[in-house]
Each structure stands twice: as C-alpha cells, then as structure tokens.
A protein has these predicted regions:
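A short, hydrophobic secondary-structure junction motif
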Residues: 111, 259-260
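C-terminal regulatory tails of eukaryotic serine/threonine kinases
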Residues: 162, 168-259
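Eukaryotic serine/threonine protein kinase catalytic domain
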Residues: 1-180
Length: 263
C-alpha cells in the first residue's frame, strides 16, 4: 500500500476555495489520465469525487477507494445505484442501465466544476430535490469561467449519456490540451506478441507466488480477464509511463537550464 502524504483533493479545495484555472487544469489532466487508464483496463470506478482523489508530496493526483468499482464486460450493462449523490450521473440515480465509463465522465465533470468554482453544480440538503436538479442537468455558470472550459463542462454534464463527451473527446478538447504533459498519455507502442518481457514476468511471479510457465500460459490464453495477464500488462504500462515521465523531466531540466539569449 502506498502512503500519500498530501491528503485529499477535497481538503485542498476546502482550504483554497476555487482554484486558478491553470492549477485546476493540471489536476484535471491527471484525473482524466487515471480514469482513462482504468477504462482501458475494463475498470469503472463509480465513486469518483475529491474525497477519493489523493495528493502526493509532489501534488500529483492518485485515484483511491475502488470499493464500488466494477469490471466492464462487453455487451453487459450495470444497474447498481452507487456512489455519492452529488457526483452521481442521472442514469445512476434513476436506476437505469449503464455501460460504465459514461458515469465516471459525469463525475469528472462535477469534479472539474468544483475545482474551478469551489462549489458543486448540483447541491441540496433535501435528496429528492438534489436528484431533480441532477436529472434536469441545469446548473449555474459563473461569469468568470472562460468559454472553452464552460464548453467542456457542459459536454461532460450532458443528461443524455449518448450525448456526453467520452474520454477521447475530452483529451482532444482545446482547453484540456493546454500545457498537457506528454507522459500522462504515453504513446501506445504496439508490442510484438511473441516477445515477452522477462522482468515483468518475474515481477508477476514474485507478487503472485507462481511459476513463469503459468504467466506464459496466461499470456498465450489471450483471456482479457486473467489476473496474471492483467498484472503483466499493468507492469508493462507502468514502466512505459515511468519512462515517459523521466523523459519529460529531462527535457524540462534542459529547457530550464538553457542560457538566456544574447542581447
């Protein structure tokens, strides 16, 4: 288990109120990077909120509390109404079927609003009234928010899940793209399926107490839900993520260390 010393993003918002746009964007980019990672590995969180987003000593966001998360299966839908009411999507509180990613997108939209405004878009002490507000999808838009971010928030807080922005649309949005660190979305380099990383295999063996032949068999089975195969690919992804982050740090170092231009 990892110790995260910076506390909850919720406490940070309570202490600081609405954040400067550049800081809100930096947090939001990291949140979307983490949610995208979960969704690519067929996991839907279902309880995203600032209380479940932790900050490390470098003020990097860590997604926590997967107690209500679920695995997504092709062609199957979820119905369970779960999560915190203020961050729950209309289809969740209405007991409708949902695929999964779209409810996390709604929650991320609420979080983005909270980062920028210091308040929630939908709030009421009376739960039935709160639910009515969520189902209408109508919320106040402060005048100080720029048009780009208002456009993004509105796309994410679409009542109709079919019209709601998806991860790819968020990643391509002009507001989201500003100062976006490349390591948050490392390039998806296709690997030769015949080449197996022996380091990653050994790490899986150490963590699960299995033999390397079992890991090889899991990879050859091509079962997307095999825990050994999932662990292997997580290790590969984490290594690629770390490599991209290291490259970004080196680039930033050389840029910062460049001599000033001659006058």
């Amino acid at each position: 288990m990892e110790y995260v010393s910076g506390g909850e993003l919720f406490d940070y918002i309570v202490k600081n109120g609405k954040l400067q746009e550049h800081e809100a964007r930096r947090f939001f980019q990291q949140i979307i990077s983490g949610v995208d990672y979960c969704h690519r590995h067929m996991i839907v969180h279902r309880d995203l909120k600032p209380e479940n987003l932790l900050l490390d000593h470098n003020m990097h966001v860590k997604i926590a509390d997967f107690g209500l998360s679920n695995m997504m299966l092709d062609g199957e839908f979820l119905r369970t109404s779960c999560g915190s009411p203020n961050y729950a999507a209309p289809e969740v509180i209405s007991g409708k079927l949902y695929a999964g990613p779209e409810v996390d997108i709604w929650s991320c939209g609420v979080i983005l609003y909270a980062l920028l405004c210091g308040t929630l878009p939908f709030d009421d002490e009376h739960v039935p009234t709160l639910f009515r507000k969520i189902k209408t999808g109508i919320f106040p838009i402060p005048e100080y928010l720029n048009k780009q971010v208002v456009n993004l928030v509105c796309q994410m807080l679409q009542v109709d899940p079919l019209k709601r922005a998806n991860i790819e649309e968020i990643k391509k949005h002009e507001w989201f793209q500003v100062d976006l660190p490349s390591y948050l979305f490392p390039s998806n380099i296709e690997q030769d399926s015949n080449v197996i990383d022996t380091y990653a295999v050994q790490e899986v063996c150490d963590k699960f107490g299995v033999k390397d032949t079992e890991v090889h068999n899991a990879l050859l089975s091509e079962d997307p839900h095999d825990q050994l195969a999932i662990a292997y690919h997580l290790i590969i992804d984490n290594q690629r993520f770390a490599d991209e982050a290291a490259k970004a740090e080196i680039n930033n170092f050389f840029v910062a260390g460049s001599p000033p231009p001659k006058l």
